[in-house]
Regions:
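Anionic-ligand anchoring segments at beta-strand to alpha-helix junctions in alpha/beta enzyme folds, i.e.
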Residues: 1-21, 186-187
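Long, contiguous, secondary-structure-rich segments that constitute the structural scaffold
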Residues: 234, 330-398, 440, 456, ...
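A glycine-rich, hydrophobic/aromatic-adjacent loop/helix-cap motif
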Residues: 142-246, 406, 416-422
Length: 555
């Protein structure tokens, strides 16, 4: 999000799922789309099979989508910017750019041209391992299409240079004018069903709803008036998850309230996270299962599942949709909204008669009649969603921005201008991953997901059908590396990084390049995040889950 926000002014899919089939070229990177976003992968395959689209896949692994690729570039982990800068070099050098679009709708072109002047495909090959002719071919294929769309997911954002990766992709789209039309754009595929909605609602440390910055005096004043706060909303952005954990370890953070998250399995460098939790004085977990984090909490608040909730989700294409409960809440469980409002009322302490404004006891009224009342407040305070109402959502989903009651929603962003006015080229200098293989740790660990499970497995591993399909985690290793080490399928192997050790069954495969190891992070029995580091992107603060130097040993 941070990368696109700086480049375009908003951090979301520019286009809709429905217009994927109108693309002539699809560039997919950092996304195992078949397993992480299966519906979207079907649209991509339909574009290829039925409409003749060409797929450029950039992924070190031979994922299922590789079978459909016209070109498959397999860079070394963490070398994406080198490849993408080289593609920009080819686009400019061979005049595969739309100069009219650049002149009318962008800024910073001269700076980008200078930044990539020496980024030849041969230079990128030396860094990434991708043959120069493949990089040139990818640039020509992308630049030669009238409608080319870019898609990515956490394979390139969970990196110490994730923002650079995203901005390098946006540079390609800006160079070729691939915005504002069907089958074009830059399209981050969000990690789960309501990640987009959570961010839209201000679930980030630096914004209020609709990405209104907390540093904006007018935005804060508007919310203070609506909420009748007795104390100003802080103008300073809050802490990210990684900052919170460091703060706990240093003693600055004393308590955590965690909902819908399992940091003791899904956060990086788990020994570091465990040490941080040991320093906390008070932990509250609001969830539907007693996951690893809930098991050590001081207080557990039983929430409800999606099937028991009312409200809205916003999916990856910015579509706000109604969610209706299928069953009543189970005994002992409560709606998240009710829990939060009850807590708010307790903190508001209406019995207090102090005339001095108290930052812990605001005057805010927590008497919402239900989810619809909350949405009414969202619409009243959020310009990009002011035209969306429950009455309209009963008919169907609406894509923001939707700024009036008769506005149809916005399937395609940036048709005439970018949210920030002009699209901004970002001159980027290649930076490698924080860790690279060496004599002591000669392999590179990559982590990700599989189709059958999700994140820490809090829900999917409690599904008997899904758990029967994949009951345990495996450690994937290149088949030739396995042969060299005398490792056979099912052998127990030990993976060690600078942070810890995990033992699990080996799965030799020809889908990984030599020198790479792959693990999912769904399984508490073999927690991959014991191995991952806590290096973060300096802007987005997202951890580097995809590049950890490790060694392998037979047990």
């Amino acid at each position: 999000m941070a990368g696109l926000a700086a480049t375009l002014g908003s951090g979301a899919m520019t286009n809709s799922i429905s217009d994927i089939r109108q693309a002539e070229v699809l560039l997919v990177t950092g996304s195992n789309t078949t397993e992480a976003h299966p519906v979207i992968s079907l649209e991509m395959k339909a574009a290829i099979r039925r409409h003749g689209a060409k797929l450029i896949l950039i992924d070190p692994r031979e994922i299922e989508l590789a079978e459909f690729a016209a070109l498959h570039l397999r860079p070394r982990t963490g070398t994406d910017v080198a490849v993408l800068n080289a593609m920009a070099h080819v686009l400019i050098g061979e005049n595969l750019i739309r100069q009219d679009f650049i002149d009318a709708r962008t800024e910073g072109f001269a700076g980008l041209s200078e930044a990539v002047r020496d980024c030849t495909p041969e230079w990128a090959e030396a860094i990434s391992g991708v043959p120069a002719d493949l990089i040139t071919g990818a640039a020509r294929l992308y630049g030669g299409a009238a409608h080319a769309a870019i898609f990515w997911a956490m394979g390139i954002t969970q990196s110490s240079h994730g923002v650079d990766n995203v901005q390098a992709l946006a540079n390609l789209a800006l160079l070729t004018g691939n915005f504002g039309r069907p089958g074009t754009g830059v399209n981050p595929l969000r990690g789960q069903n309501n990640v987009q909605g959570a961010c839209d609602m201000g679930g980030l440390p630096n914004v209020l709803t609709g990405y209104q910055p907390v540093t904006d005096d007018a935005a804060r004043a508007k919310f203070e008036a609506a909420w009748q706060t007795a104390f100003p909303i802080p103008a300073k952005p809050g802490l990210t998850v990684t900052d919170l954990m460091n703060g706990a370890l240093e003693g600055h953070i004393k308590a955590l309230y965690i909902t819908g998250e399992n940091p003791l399995l899904s956060d990086p460098n788990l020994h570091h996270i465990q040490s941080a939790f040991e320093k906390l004085e008070f932990v509250v977990v609001q969830d539907i299962f007693l996951n690893e984090t809930a098991q050590i909490a001081d207080v557990v608040l039983p929430g409800v599942s999606f099937a028991e909730k009312e409200g809205t989700y916003t999916n990856t294409e910015r579509r706000v949709q109604r969610v209706r409960h299928a069953i009543p809440a189970l005994d002992g469980a409560r709606l998240d909204l009710d829990i939060i409002c009850d807590l708010g009322r307790r903190l508001a302490a209406p019995e207090s008669t102090s005339a001095v404004p108290d930052p812990v006891h605001p005057v805010c009224n927590w008497d919402y009649s239900g989810p619809a009342a909350v949405w009414d407040e969202i619409a009243a305070l959020t310009p990009s969603m002011s035209g969306i109402s429950y009455a309209r959502l009963e008919i169907g989903g609406i894509q923001w921005p939707c700024t009036s009651a008769d506005h149809p929603g916005t399937p395609i962003l940036h048709r005439e201008k970018f949210t920030r006015g002009l699209g901004r080229f970002m001159p980027l200098v290649y930076r490698g991953p924080m860790e690279t293989p060496d004599e002591d740790f000669p392999f590179m660990l990559n982590t990700g997901r599989m189709l059958q499970h999700w994140h820490g497995g809090t829900m999917s591993r409690r599904s008997a059908g899904l758990d029967a399909l994949v009951p345990e985690g495996h450690i994937e290793i290149n088949i030739l590396d396995a042969q060299d080490m005398g490792i056979y399928p099912g052998d127990m192997i030990r993976v060690t990084s600078r942070r810890g050790t995990v033992v699990g069954p080996a799965r030799p495969t020809d889908r990984l390049p030599r020198g790479m190891v792959f693990m999912t992070f769904h399984f508490a029995e073999s927690p991959a995040n014991v191995l991952t580091g806590d290096a973060v992107d300096p802007v987005a603060k997202i951890p580097e889950y995809k590049a950890s130097a490790v060694r392998i040993e037979r047990v």
